[in-house]
Structures are given as C-alpha cells and as structure tokens.
Amino acid sequence: MKFFLATLFASAVSSIAVDRLIPGAQIIPESDTRALLRVGGHHDKYHDRRTITIRPSRNDTDDVSRDFLWGIKHANHGGRLLLKKGEKYVIGRKLDLTFLDDIEVQLDGELKFTDDVSYWQENNFYYDFQKSITFWRWGGKDIKIFGTGLLNGNGQRWYNEFAGQEILDPDNEYYRPILFLTENATRISVEGITQLNSPCWTNFFIQSKDVSFDDVYIHAFSTNKSALPKNSDGFDSLNVDGLTVTNTRVDVGDDCFSPKPNTTNIFVQNLLCNNTHGVSMGSIGQYPGVMDIIEHAYIENVTLLNGQNGARLKAWAGQDVGYGRINNITYKNIRIENTDAPVVLDQCYFDIEAAECAQYPSQVNVTNILFENISGTSSGKNGKVVADLVCSPNAVCSDIQLKNINLTSPAGSPPEIVCEGVQGDIGVECQASAD
C-alpha cells in the first residue's frame, strides 16, 4: 500500500510538472547530470542546479518575453535559467524582475531587445534621475548572471534618431533605454558576458548593495558616422553600497565607470577603457538642495586609451544645484595614453559658462584624494597641461595628493600640473590656471 501511494504521489507530481511546461521549455532536475551537460547547463564555478530552458526566437521579430519571464519564475528559488549557445532570445516587452531570490541565469546565447522605439517610449520603467528609462529591472537577492553570451541593446536606431540631442537638455523627451538596471538588489553578480550597443547607459544600479562585475566586455559602436553612440556609459550607480568591477574592458564613447550620487565602497581593478570619458567620480550635486556623496573608492590597475578624460572628479555648479562631498578616493597604478585631460577635477559641470560657474560655484567638497603611480601621455589638446585640479571657491578641497606622476604631453616639455584653491601641499609642483 505504501509503495502504491508513493508511486501515485510521484506520478501526480510529475504530471503537474509537465502541465506547467510551456511549448519549447524544459525543466531538468539538478540530479540529472547527463541532461545538464547535454544542454550546456553546467558551469564549473557553480554547483549543478535545477535548470530551465526556453524556446529561442525564430527571427528578430519573434518576441519570447513571456517565455523568458516564465523561465525566470521557474528558475527562481534555487534554479538556473539557461539561454543556449548559438540561439537568440528576443525581448520585445518590458519586464519587472524585482522578485528574485537565489537564481542563476546562464547566458551563453544572445539576448536581444527589439528596436521598436514607439513601444519602448511608451512602455518602460522610468526614473526621475536624469530622466532614465529601462527595458527591464532586476531586483531581489542572490542573483548571478554568467556565461559567454551577448546582451544586445540593438542601439543603432536609437543612435540615429537621437543624433544632435542631449540627455541633460531639460526639453529632451526622446528617452532611451538603459541596457541593464538593478533596483533594490542585494548580492548581484555578472560574469563573462558581452554587453553590446546599449541605447543609453549600459548599466545602472539603483538602491542596491554588493554589486559585482567580472570579466565583462562592454562595447558600443555605430555604423553611421554622423550618429555615434551617446551617453553609453559603462557603469552608473545611484544609492549603492558596495560596487566592484574587475577584469573588464569598456569601449563606449562616454564614461567608462561613473558612480553617481550616494555610492560608497567602490572597488575597481584591472579595467581597460578605450575611447571613453574616463573613470569618473560623479557627477554629483545636480539637483537643487540635495546632498550627494561618493565615498570610499579604490581604483587600481586601470588603462585608459584614446579618451576625453582619464581619472576625473566631477561636480555640478550653477544657480540651482545641490551640494555634498567626494571623499576618500584612491587612483593607483593608472596608465593613460592619448587622452585630452589625464587627471582632472571638474567643478564646473555640466555645460556651464565660466562666468556662471564663477557666480554660482560648486558646493561639493573634495577631500582625501590620492593619485599615485599615474603614467602615460596626454593628447596635447590642452597644451602641456596633464593634470588640472581647480577647486570651487565655495567648497573645501583638502588632503589631495599626487605621487609618482609620470605624464607627458606631445605639446612640449615640461608637462604642467594646474592646481587652484586646493588647501595644503599636493605633493608636486603646480601652477595657477592660465584662464
């Protein structure tokens, strides 16, 4: 009798599991190692898990958003969603994935968003901060995304239609989606994948804790020379504690790494930035009456090539802006080549005339900053100046140190370091701004 009841129960459970499947999907238990290996649902860095597969898209218009959401829900609480190598999965509907708890997503294929601009302009997740929108949002705890695959923002149409516009223009109403966004996420990691052609910022982390990226390649390029990618930052953050980026390469045409307000405990190591606006702290201080901070950052072993800026601190100035501090930041072992402004403190951000900046200076304090072992060349665009540290008269800039700086300029020798309004000895000879 016991055997009969057990058999009946097992049969019922199996029947329920089959009934829950959608066409083209599969649920493989963690004990079935052969089946896991057959589909590629195995990774030596992570233990075997219940693995879910879904059907791939037949073409670039075959939206599998509902299948993807089904797969995420069934992989939640201890499972893994596998997106197979050689397959494409097209997402054409916004997805709220903020319910996650102990899940892995193995991205070995291509996950691609549609470029239906009219749909995404009306259907997205909107955030007031710099009028940000996204295709989807990820949240919850213990989330791992890994693999050898591609997350494709399909940005070319967005580049074409946004050409000549500016994201920070108060009249701008052409909002472009962020490729990957977390909100209220704790312990989320991304490893091994490529992120391609985000319409706007590539990654934006909001109200999250312990975010890590390792061995990721981020690239944004355009096939239209008159419509290049714009605002395609590699990494941005807002209200985040614990942000780590290691062994990563970024080629985007805007900020390589740029934590925004209230980001603390930052660690960056072994980062290569090509054709970017640099590794920036900020910008902060944008919104009237609001206090922002960036604090406790350690940036080490970074290479910056062919860019606008290298190591940069940036804060807003103007009549209606905020205040705050950038504190305890270390840039160490930084190699910079062919870069307009290798080391810069910019407290006249953004797009503000010198007269207005002088009338309404930044109120962001900059303290405990170390630039150590910085070497390479500028582009010569700013003459012989290789470091430009000009502090706002309405802010405190103190304990700023430059050690072992070996930067040269093709504009001539000796290279010049500008410092103005900085309290105390900065460790090297410097001169006042010529402006």
From Swiss-Prot:
Record-linked InterPro entries: Glyco_hydro_28, Pectin_lyas_fold, Pectin_lyase_fold/virulence
The keyword Cell wall biogenesis/degradation appears for this protein: yes
Glycosylation sites recorded in the entry for this protein: N59, N184, N224, N262, N274, N301, N328, N365, N373, N406
Reactions performed catalytically: [(1->4)-alpha-D-galacturonosyl](n) + H2O = alpha-D-galacturonate + [(1->4)-alpha-D-galacturonosyl](n-1)
Compartment annotation: Secreted
E.C. number: 3.2.1.67
Example of a GO MF term: polygalacturonase activity
Principal EC category: hydrolase
Pfam families: Glyco_hydro_28
Gene Ontology biological process terms from the UniProt entry: cell wall organization; pectin catabolic process
Disulfide bonding pattern of the chain: C256-C273, C391-C397
Keywords: Cell wall biogenesis/degradation, Disulfide bond, Glycoprotein, Glycosidase, Hydrolase, Repeat, Secreted, Signal
Known role: Specific in hydrolyzing the terminal glycosidic bond of polygalacturonic acid and oligogalacturonates.
PANTHER family according to UniProt: EXOPOLYGALACTURONASE B-RELATED, PTHR31736
Family per similarity comment: Belongs to the glycosyl hydrolase 28 family.
The protein's name in its UniProt record: Probable exopolygalacturonase B
Protein source organism: Aspergillus flavus (strain ATCC 200026 / FGSC A1120 / IAM 13836 / NRRL 3357 / JCM 12722 / SRRC 167)
Gene: pgxB
